[in-house]
A protein has these predicted regions:
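Basic, Gly/Ser/Thr-rich N-terminal segments that form RNA-phosphate-binding interfaces in CRISPR RAMP
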Residues: 1-174
Length: 174
């Protein structure tokens, strides 16, 4: 695998609470899994837990082999979150990793070949997953059409469309 989707137990619980507001009722299915992963992370010196089968030669940047544990039953978590290849990181380590690992891109506004404004941007890595809710209790037909268009098309969020950033695919979590 070339990358894993990193998250924390706290973020997953926030997602479950959020999705329950929309009637998804996923808490019972996943809470036992989260408790098992928490037990693995409570062990001294453990900083991350890979959800999936242990693979020979697996390397997760920033973590030594003895700092990583494995949780082999990834079906429930992957189905609820809609993603595969997950690594759960302790909250304090996650914050540190994010602050060190977000790509920073230097940008420069040029006017007639001369620099007028140099600035730096942190960008969210490709394949990042976000969640949001969309509700409408009125105008059901228009709402269904809106949701269909969201799922069928890429949506550009934020600036930087000209350099390929911000293109987003919306999918309903089932």
């Amino acid at each position: 695998k070339s990358y894993f989707m990193g998250t924390t137990i706290e973020i997953i619980r926030e997602y479950i609470e959020f999705s329950n507001l929309f009637g998804k009722n996923t808490e019972n299915k996943i809470e036992e899994v989260l408790k098992e992963i928490e037990k693995k992370l409570d062990v001294k010196d453990k900083k991350a837990c890979v959800v999936g089968v242990k693979e020979e030669g697996l390397f997760i940047e920033s973590f030594e082999d003895n700092e990583i544990d494995f949780y082999s039953d990834n079906d429930a978590l992957s189905q609820i979150l809609g993603i595969q290849d997950i690594v759960i990181i302790k909250e304090e380590n996650f914050k540190d990793e994010i602050s060190k690992r977000l790509p920073v891109v230097a940008r420069n506004y040029l006017e007639e070949g001369k620099s007028k404004n140099l600035w730096y941007e942190e960008v969210v890595p490709r394949e990042s997953v976000f969640y949001t809710g969309v509700i409408n209790s009125q105008h059901i037909d228009e709402f269904e059409d809106f949701c269909k268009k969201l799922e069928e098309n890429l949506v550009q969020i934020g600036a930087n469309a000209t350099i390929g950033y911000g293109f987003t695919k919306f999918e309903e979590v089932k």
